[in-house]
């Protein structure tokens, strides 16, 4: 099971909510969500691997996840997205029908926070689309005029593309003839 849960506590912050509700005209068009800080839950098999990481710009995190999803759908060998402060990055590497997740903190000393997690590619893509749709719905609940913002329009377009994208067939892992096989055993001889 895999789920992305964009934080929603920002909606209860009077500063964010009143500022968003008052946006109009050119300010709506220029809205990019950069001031909205919240957490992003990343749930793998019932465990939130991002628990305790902290708040970061929510719209930026969701945007980067959607872009990473588009890169993977286009056959890129890897993608990454900011998922927390520091920055904390989620690295995504296709492995057949799955995607290998590694979460790293680049705050010195850089370290791996979670790794070796395989997630079904289609579930990952659905979770990315769902997270983006939830953030847009929450924004529009506060100010429906935000529908006209460049950011919301671009993200909506990207979500449509991601949800419809035919995934480029993933290469088998490890690639045939790879000298990187290291710890990958194809068979065990007795």
Could you say what each language-model-derived stretch is?
Residues 110-176:
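Mixed-charge, glycine-accented linear interaction segment located at domain edges/termini
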Residues 70, 74, 104, 137-140:
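Charged/polar positions within long, soluble alpha-helices
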Residues 52-84:
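Compact, well-ordered interaction domains used in eukaryotic information-processing assemblies
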Residues 63, 97-100, 126-133:
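Generic structural signal for well-ordered, non-transmembrane alpha-helical segments
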Residues 184-189:
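Low-complexity, intrinsically disordered tandem-repeat tracts enriched in small/polar residues
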Residues 76-124:
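An exposed acidic His-Trp-rich patch
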Residues 1-60:
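N-terminal low-complexity, intrinsically disordered segments
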């Amino acid at each position: 099971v895999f789920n992305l849960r964009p934080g929603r506590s920002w909606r209860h912050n009077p500063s964010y909510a009143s500022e968003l509700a008052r946006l109009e005209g050119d300010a709506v068009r220029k809205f990019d969500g950069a001031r909205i800080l919240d957490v992003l839950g990343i749930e793998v098999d019932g465990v939130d691997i991002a628990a305790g990481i902290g708040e970061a710009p929510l719209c930026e995190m969701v945007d980067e996840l959607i872009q990473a999803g588009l890169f993977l759908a286009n056959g890129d060998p890897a993608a990454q997205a900011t998922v927390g402060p520091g920055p904390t990055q989620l690295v995504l590497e296709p492995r057949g029908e799955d995607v290998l997740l590694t979460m790293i903190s680049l705050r010195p000393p850089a370290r791996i926070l979670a790794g070796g997690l395989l997630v079904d590619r289609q579930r990952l893509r659905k979770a990315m689309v769902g997270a983006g749709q939830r953030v847009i719905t929450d924004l529009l609940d506060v100010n429906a005029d935000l529908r006209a913002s460049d950011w919301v329009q671009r993200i909506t377009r990207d979500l449509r593309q991601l949800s419809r994208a035919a995934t480029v067939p993933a290469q088998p892992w490890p690639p045939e003839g790879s000298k990187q096989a290291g710890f990958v055993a194809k068979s065990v001889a007795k």
